[in-house]
A protein has these predicted regions:
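Sec-exported extracytoplasmic/periplasmic mature domains
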Residues: 13-21, 40-44, 61-68
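Hydrophobic alpha-helical
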Residues: 1-38
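Flexible, solvent-exposed loop/hinge segments that line or gate ligand/substrate-binding clefts
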Residues: 31, 50, 95
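Hinge/cleft segment of the Venus flytrap/periplasmic-binding protein
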Residues: 58-117
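Short beta-strand elements at the ligand-binding edges of bilobed clamshell
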Residues: 41-53
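Short, charged, surface-exposed secondary-structure boundary motifs
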Residues: 35-39, 56-60
């Protein structure tokens, strides 16, 4: 089941357990702490991790350009909101599963600790 976020993904799992049903393959979004634990326990199948450090780095790069009186770095794409073309600085989301969680969170001691304990 594709869920719009991790909270609902965990609610699906809880509901299935409560009804005595098998847990289906459940995907979430946001890489919430409880869902990382659930993935590691073999319940939730996956979540989508958004690379926050990359997002912050891109934001700082844009702000630094503005502080220097420069234009924002060129965006690879844009979307018209009905008024203007809004630049899009897309970062690749990362699908996290039990099979790759350790690798994905290897540089994140807080998240890695969730897998160890």
């Amino acid at each position: 089941m594709l869920s719009p976020n991790d909270g609902i993904a965990r609610a699906i799992i809880t509901s299935c357990k409560g009804a005595g049903q098998d847990i289906p393959v459940v995907d979430g979004l946001d890489a919430e702490t409880e869902s990382i634990k659930s993935i590691w326990a073999g319940e939730q199948y996956s979540t989508v991790h958004k690379p926050t450090k990359d997002l912050v780095a891109k934001t700082v790069e844009i702000i630094a350009a503005f502080q220097k009186g420069e234009e924002a770095p060129a965006a690879e794409e844009s979307e018209n909101n009905g008024v203007i073309d809004v630049p899009i600085y897309a970062l690749d989301p990362i699908v996290v599963t039990e099979a790759n969680a350790e690798e994905i969170f290897a540089e994140d001691p807080d998240r890695l600790a969730l897998l160890e304990g």
